[in-house]
Amino acid sequence: MARLNVKPTRMELSNLKNRLKTATRGHKLLKDKRDELMRRFVDLIRENNELRQTIEKELAANMKEFVLAKASENSLMVEELFAVPVHEVTLWIDIENIMSVNVPKFHVQSNTAREQEQGEFAYSYLSSNSEMDNTIQKTKELLEKLLRLAEVEKTCQLMADDIEKTRRRVNGLEYSIIPQLKETIHYIELKLEEAERASLVRIMKITS
């Protein structure tokens, strides 16, 4: 490891020792951050996989139920049921800081004035069968899970990027900066010891 190109003076030695303390402390903090990010990242990956499997199963089941419910209805009536969009959804995003990583938090609010006027469903449920009602309601309930899945996947992406950045910084300190500082400190200490011995020899010669 090449040492730093500095003058071998006591002032430089003191500066380098301070830099080494700072680098060592920073290295520990970054390692702790990296380890905690990795722990949370693994938890989120697990949640992401479980959520995706659950949503895929529920969507497949809902689709089958919808096909069966649709089969017992007149095609024109089914089109009329969904002809007018009356379900209004408001989505907003907050930012949460996790280990210095800004991640999104999705919030959703259903604003359905016509639903309140017409009843539980946002379409003419009086004209539909109970199977269709249940299928539509189950699909609506999936919205929160879908938003959570999007939130988790985006958080995983942002965390993965920050983990990689932190890993590079840790490696830079561990394998480059800290060894350079240590080697340069050792070099200056040797030079100062040599200068001190040479000075002592000169003094002894003068006094002898």
UniProtKB/Swiss-Prot annotation:
GO biological process entries: proton motive force-driven plasma membrane ATP synthesis
Keywords associated with the record: ATP synthesis, Hydrogen ion transport, Ion transport, Transport
Annotated signal sequence range: none
Single GO term (MF): ATP binding
Keyword Cell membrane assigned: no
Pfam families named in the record: ATP-synt_D
PANTHER family registered for this protein in UniProt: V-TYPE ATP SYNTHASE SUBUNIT D
Role according to the record: Produces ATP from ADP in the presence of a proton gradient across the membrane.
Family according to the record: Belongs to the V-ATPase D subunit family.
Name assigned to this protein: V-type ATP synthase subunit D
Source species: Streptococcus pyogenes serotype M1
Lineage of producing organism: Bacteria, Bacillati, Bacillota, Bacilli, Lactobacillales
Underlying gene: atpD
